[in-house]
Amino acid sequence: MARSPCCEKNGLKKGPWTSEEDQKLVDYIQKHGYGNWRTLPKNAGLQRCGKSCRLRWTNYLRPDIKRGRFSFEEEETIIQLHSFLGNKWSAIAARLPGRTDNEIKNFWNTHIRKKLLRMGIDPVTHSPRLDLLDISSILASSLYNSSSHHMNMSRLMMDTNRRHHQQHPLVNPEILKLATSLFSQNQNQNLVVDHDSRTQEKQTVYSQTGVNQYQTNQYFENTITQELQSSMPPFPNEARQFNNMDHHFNGFGEQNLVSTSTTSVQDCYNPSFNDYSSSNFVLDPSYSDQSFNFANSVLNTPSSSPSPTTLNSSYINSSSCSTEDEIESYCSNLMKFDIPDFLDVNGFII
């Protein structure tokens, strides 16, 4: 006896499911379970066939469905299971919790199959096929630029010859030679690029090291200069005190010298000064003393003052005998004097 169709064509709804239909199906399965999919639509009050209800529940409405992109581990599992099971998507979905058979089939046809073809692998037998290998995409792909994913062409040819013992080879040997040369050339270019990048990195490191060393030297020089300036004794203050004292003594000597020289020169050139004669002043032995006492010898009054007659005669004689040379010698002798020992300034010099 032949099996009757799952649903009658008259009065059944086809097309997308509405939210009301989804809610009715979920409520019925949560209360009674799905049971027999042939009788479920009639019991749940749905104008759908049993197959449509099963697919709607399995692929969209069941609570344990895993949404989102497939992970790398799930992709590897699908490839391995497909190499053993083939296109048995329900069996593959049973080993991937949370994934549906329809979702796995769509992911295989849209992503995994195309990826295997680009890698030169037959998606049916999972064996290498160089006639399916897209060399341009491999050379442009960053996956094969890394050293860990370079394809070994000689190993690939050995595996092909071992697995397929046929009279006619699968691939033309000229294509194999071309592929091998392209891979080797690409590898050499990668080595040159890596060498250039490493050289540039070393030059950058050397330049940065030189700049850092120069900045460090400048920092240490500034630090040493500041420490020396902070540790120096207050020499400027002592020098200022010494300059004040030196100025004081110089002012003292200049004042006495100016007053004395002025008085002496006036005494020399004044013909009518009292109590002193120019001859006595010039010939006074006290001027041989090289000290500051010459002012006292000039200003002190002699013990015995001569008479006016003697003064006049001595003044006339001195006037007749003195010349310009004597005046110059007198002035030069007047400027010659030594600083006494008690004014020794060596003690002030540090």
From Swiss-Prot:
Annotated ranges, domain HTH myb-type: 9-65, 66-116
Main location: nucleus
Example of a GO biological process term: regulation of DNA-templated transcription
Annotated DNA-binding residue span(s): 37-61, 89-112
Keywords (A to Z) from UniProt: DNA-binding, Nucleus, Plant defense, Repeat, Stress response, Transcription, Transcription regulation
Alphabetized InterPro entries for the sequence: Homeodomain-like_sf, Myb_dom, Myb_TF_plants, SANT/Myb
A cellular-component GO term for this protein: nucleus
Recorded GO MF terms: DNA binding; DNA-binding transcription factor activity
Source species, domain of life: Eukaryota
Upregulation: Induced by light. Induced by wounding, salt stress and abscisic acid. Induced by the lepidopteran herbivore Pieris rapae (white cabbage butterfly) feeding.
Subcellular location(s) of the protein: Nucleus
Tissues of expression: Expressed in rosette leaves, cauline leaves and flowers.
Pfam families with a match to the protein in the record: Myb_DNA-binding
SUPFAM superfamilies found in the cross-reference section: Homeodomain-like
Consequences of knocking out this gene: No visible phenotype under normal growth conditions, but mutant plant show increased susceptibility to the herbivore Pieris rapae (white cabbage butterfly) feeding.
PANTHER family: F14D16.11-RELATED
Described purpose of this protein according to its UniProt entry: Probable transcription factor that may function in osmotic stress and wounding signaling pathways. Contributes to basal resistance against the herbivore Pieris rapae (white cabbage butterfly) feeding.
Protein name: Transcription factor MYB102
